């Protein structure tokens, strides 16, 4: 079974089971869908004069397309004004001292992610895929943007909503055996 709701201005997948009172054979998939207006058209205006409207879970405003084939279905997320491939934000420091690698965390906000998502990262295209762990937390970029925008004395936009602990964040530790130099982090989500 599947159901969809919205008007919460964030995206989330919930799987409702017997512990929640659901009596079906399989868990009920409830989708809290994104909104086109994101965070009610709030936030700093972009180059086109439109508020960025990032939602409180750090996901961009957008829409979903749901396709059905009998009892099977798929849900694809599309960020407004962005290419279809824009499905996540990755958070990693630009510079890390060799001695700090052991405590460096890489984060990914997989906008359409759920507890059923398999997320992994690797450093450089030859590296081993490292599983990432789901972590309910505040999107750091959303939090920082909210603080920056609220600190501006002459703002001409409406403040962003309160931060939200989103379940579609993943984290992993940076590998410690990296040579000094520039590296590329790649993240895949299935």
Predicted region positions:
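Long, low-complexity serine/threonine/glycine- and acidic-rich segments characteristic of extracellular
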Residues: 88-190
């Amino acid at each position: 079974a599947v159901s969809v709701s919205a008007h919460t201005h964030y995206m989330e997948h919930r799987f409702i089971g017997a512990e929640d009172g659901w009596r079906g054979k399989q868990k009920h998939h409830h989708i809290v869908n994104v909104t086109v207006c994101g965070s009610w058209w709030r936030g700093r205006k972009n180059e086109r004069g439109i508020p960025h409207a990032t939602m409180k879970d750090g996901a961009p405003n957008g829409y979903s397309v749901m396709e059905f084939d009998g009892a099977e279905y798929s849900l694809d997320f599309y960020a407004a004004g962005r290419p279809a491939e824009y499905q996540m934000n990755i958070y990693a420091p630009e510079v890390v001292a060799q001695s700090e690698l052991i405590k460096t965390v890489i984060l990914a906000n997989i906008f359409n992610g759920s507890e059923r998502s398999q997320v992994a990262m690797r450093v450089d295209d030859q590296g081993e895929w490292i599983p990432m762990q789901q972590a309910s937390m505040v999107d750091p970029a959303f939090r920082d943007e909210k603080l920056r925008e609220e600190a501006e004395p002459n703002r001409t936009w409406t403040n962003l909503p309160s931060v939200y602990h989103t379940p579609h964040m993943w984290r992993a530790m940076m590998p410690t055996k990296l040579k000094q130099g520039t590296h590329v982090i790649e993240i895949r989500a299935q």
